[in-house]
Every structure is written in C-alpha cells, then in structure tokens.
C-alpha cells in the first residue's frame, strides 16, 4: 500500500514535469472550452526546539515533524457564454490527493504513534477526495452555484469572524497554515440576485446559501492524540467519543447576506447565518456501559452568527480600511463545574453552557514606497486588530486546554485582543517575494513567520520559519514548543 502511494505521487510528479508548467485548453465549438490545470507540492518541516510541557510525543529539535505531499488537478469547462437570449453555464471539478509521510519514515516517536493507533493514523495520514465539484448558472441579475464549494463572507485574514461557513482543517499545520488552505469545501446551493442601483447604493445584491443537514455534515477534523499539531494535553484517562451533528434539517448550515456599494466607495454587507463550530464541545459523561463508567464526549454544536462588514478606499492616505463585526448567539463555552462535574465529586453527566460573544476587527491595507530597501516595487502592509467580548461571562470560564505541569485548565478572559501584521514586497520582476507575518497577543505571546518565495516557472520554492515566543498559556503561545522551519516545492501546470 505504501509503495502504491509513492508510485501514485511520483507518477503525478512526472506528469507535471512533462507538462512543463503549461495549462492546456481544448475548445468545443464556438461557445465552450475546457481547461485543465493543477499543482504538485511537497513540504518538509523540521522542529527547531525540544518538546516541552504536555506535548506528545517527545521530539528533539532538528527532527522532521511534517512531510506533506499534495497534488491537485482542476477542470474548468464553459459550456455556453451569456448572450441576450442564452445564459452562461459552466462547471468546475477539482481532485485532491494528500499523503503525510512522517508516520511512515519520520522520527521513531511518530512511527510509534502510528503503531499504537494504526487504524486512526492510517486513515488520518492520507486523503483522496473529490475536493470541489460545482456548476454555475448566470443569466442577467441571477447567479446560482450548486455543488461542493467554498464560501467566504468575511474581510479578515489569519483569524475568522464572519468567515466561518466552511469548516477548517487545523490538523496539518494548524495556525501555521494559510486560512485559504485550511477551508474544507462542503455541498451547498448558493444563489445571488443583483438589484442594480437603488438610490446611493450600487450593485445591491442579495445572496443566500444552504448546506443541507439531513444529508450528513462535513465538520472540522479532530487531530488524533500524538499528531504533530494537536494541542498539548495529558494522555486521556477515559474513553473519548467524538459525535458529529445528527442528520437533521435543524443542523443545516444556511444564511443570507445583502451587500452593496454606497457612494461608489463604501462596500457594505449585512449577514446572518447558522454554521457548525470547528472545535467540538467537551462534557464528561457518566455511562455504565464503558470501563470505569466515565467517558469524555466531544460534540459539534451549531451556532448562529449575525454581523456586518465594510471596506473603503481613502484617497488622501492611499489606504484601504476594513472593518467587521460579528455577534455569536449562544456559543458553547467551557466551565469545568458544568461541563465536567465529575471532576469535582459530583458524579452526574455534564452539560454544555452557552453565551453570546461579540467579536470585531479593524484593519487597513497600504502600499507605499521605501526605496532604501526596494527601488522597483512597493511595500505591501496589512494590519488588523481583533477583539472578542463574552457578554454573560462566568468567572469559572476556562479554555479546555491543560496548563503544565499540574493539568489545571487555562484561563478564559472576558475580553481578549490580538494584533496581526503582514508585510511583503517583490524583487526580480516579481519572482522573489520576502514576507514577514506577525501575530501579537498583549497578554504575552508572539508568533512570527518570516518567509521567502522564489518562482522559476513552473516551479515555486518557499522557505519559512514559524516562531513562537512568550507565555505558554496565552493563545498562540500554547504551541510555543512547535517552532519549525519548512521548505516547500510546488510544481504548477
């Protein structure tokens, strides 16, 4: 089986090499065309520090923690172009193949994780999937897209506010992965109607989507214990049971958004939708059918979100300003005395407490000249300030993450904020891109990601360092011992 996967990957790689980076298109008559593109990517990541705290397994600095191989192939076919009498109709297909090799030929510690839990790890380390598959219909003010797809309604990067429709895959790199690369496409029907110009509002558009819950829901995967990017925690002492949402209409993802441009500058949107939390909620259950009569149940809960976003260009400052606000109705939280009363001598099954949460972001994007470091290209800067506020805060509220070494739960503050900054520029006619990304938590943690990317068409090479410093019980600092250096090679065709 291992040899088969290696052979498949090498075969795809050689196919891409023979294509020499060129997309190809096949025309069908005068109206349609078919285009096939893709990429093959391999990444190796090495841990730069020793394992600390509850991180398992123990891995010394310099050891490999990731060897991810990814291949995608996309097909886009335009069947008809829009005319006065005919609609535009096209479809899109994308296949994705993923294989993580660290469990097969990585450090012994990760090979031992696989041997201890072969069924779970063997299923986790590879994926062959019809990643995207949808059809588009466009006629006048109407647009419909039906199929497996991504949908993003937010203005934010790095962290999500309104952009929580699709589940995220945090198991193959966690916070070190780009947000766009973590979204998991889901089956949905999506429609838009453009009302045109109404008063001072232009391009007033109503949009809605529905991801049916009675047909089975896609949820954010849960990282197995011992995987490189799982949150640090002591080994489980009771059975852990993961429960996906029931197949009911009530568990559908669905929402509506209205957006438009005011005075030809202010892009404004209002939205409301229901989605499924990416992190399952934990309760301790008293169950006589399991050994010891105690189990930990993890359940994916639904949440409704109401929010707004706006962006506009300020000519005097040559800057784009962005803002977004979201109200999360009855979001699950973790209060040990309620979720896990058995830990306090009260042997009854726990419950999931909920509260409303306000989250917002203010940011700006600016391009400027700094000729001291770059005479030919501008510097790109993207700044964001994030904040969240728990309205019905309980002083007992915690994060479901254990603090080392005694295992008490980490504090969840009523008000928390973070700053993000991304700066980049280009050299060598746009083929060399250095970038620095920062995430700062005022409570005492900093994540910094310097990287450099060079393209030699059809190849793209990237070298990045993922560093974390500060307190190990504060947001990004929880993964403080996961610092790594990564090298990635991508072949596009």
Q: Over which residues does each language-model region extend?
A:
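Transmembrane beta-strands of outer-membrane beta-barrel pores
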Residues: 42-48, 95-101, 139-141, 150-152, ...
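Outer membrane beta-barrel
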Residues: 83-227, 466-471
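Transmembrane beta-strand segments of Gram-negative outer membrane beta-barrel proteins
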Residues: 27-55, 89-97, 101
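Residues on the lipid-exposed face of transmembrane beta-strands in outer-membrane beta-barrel proteins
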Residues: 71-77, 93, 132-137, 189-193, ...
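Short loop/turn motifs that connect adjacent beta-strands in outer-membrane beta-barrel proteins
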Residues: 24-36, 76-91, 138-141, 145, ...
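Detector for outer-membrane/organellar transmembrane beta-barrel domains
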Residues: 82, 86, 273-275, 322-332, ...
């Amino acid at each position: 089986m291992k040899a088969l996967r290696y052979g498949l990957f090498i075969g795809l790689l050689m196919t891409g090499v023979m294509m020499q980076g060129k997309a190809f298109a096949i025309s069908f008559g005068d109206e349609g065309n078919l285009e096939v593109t893709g990429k093959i990517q391999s990444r190796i990541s090495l841990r730069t520090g020793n394992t600390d705290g509850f991180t398992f397994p123990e891995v010394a600095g310099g050891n490999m923690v990731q060897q991810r191989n990814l291949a995608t192939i996309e097909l886009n076919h335009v069947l008809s172009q829009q005319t006065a009498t005919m609609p535009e109709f096209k479809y899109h297909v994308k296949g994705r193949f993923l294989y993580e090799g660290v469990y097969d030929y990585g450090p012994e510690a990760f090979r031992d994780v696989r041997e201890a839990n072969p069924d779970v790890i063997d299923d986790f380390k590879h994926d062959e999937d019809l990643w995207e598959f949808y059809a588009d219909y466009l006629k006048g003010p109407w647009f419909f897209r039906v199929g497996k797809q991504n949908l993003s309604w937010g203005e934010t990067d790095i962290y999500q506010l309104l952009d929580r429709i699709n589940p995220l895959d945090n198991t193959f790199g966690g916070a070190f992965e780009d947000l766009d690369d973590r979204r998991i496409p889901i089956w949905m029907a999506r429609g838009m109607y453009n009302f045109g110009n109404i008063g001072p509002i232009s391009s007033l558009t109503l949009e809605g989507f529905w991801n049916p819950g009675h047909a089975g829901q896609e949820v954010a995967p849960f990282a197995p214990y011992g995987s490189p990017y799982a949150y640090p925690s002591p080994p489980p002492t009771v059975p852990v049971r993961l429960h996906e949402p029931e197949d009911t209409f009530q568990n559908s993802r669905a929402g509506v958004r209205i957006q438009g441009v005011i005075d030809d500058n202010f892009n404004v949107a209002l939205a409301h939708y229901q989605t499924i939390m990416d992190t399952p909620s934990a309760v301790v259950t008293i169950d006589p059918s399991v050994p010891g009569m105690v189990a930990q149940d993890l359940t994916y809960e639904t949440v409704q979100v109401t929010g707004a976003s706006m962006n506009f260009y300020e000519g005097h400052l040559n800057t784009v300003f962005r803002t977004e606000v979201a109200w999360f109705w009855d979001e699950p939280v973790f209060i040990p005395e309620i979720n896990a009363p058995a830990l306090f001598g009260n042997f009854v099954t726990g419950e999931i407490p909920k509260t409303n949460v306000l989250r917002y972001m203010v940011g700006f994007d600016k391009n400027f000249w700094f000729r001291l470091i770059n005479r030919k290209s501008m510097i790109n800067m993207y700044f964001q300030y994030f904040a969240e506020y728990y309205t019905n805060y309980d002083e007992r509220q915690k994060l479901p993450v254990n603090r080392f070494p005694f295992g008490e739960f980490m504090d969840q503050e009523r008000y928390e904020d973070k700053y993000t900054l991304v700066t980049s520029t280009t050299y060598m006619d746009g083929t060399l891109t250095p970038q620095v990304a920062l995430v700062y938590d005022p409570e005492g943690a900093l994540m910094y990601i310097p990287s450099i990317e060079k393209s030699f068409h059809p190849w793209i090479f990237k070298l990045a360092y993922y560093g974390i410093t500060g307190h190990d019980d504060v947001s990004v600092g929880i993964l403080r011992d996961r610092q790594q250096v990564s090298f990635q090679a991508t072949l596009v065709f």
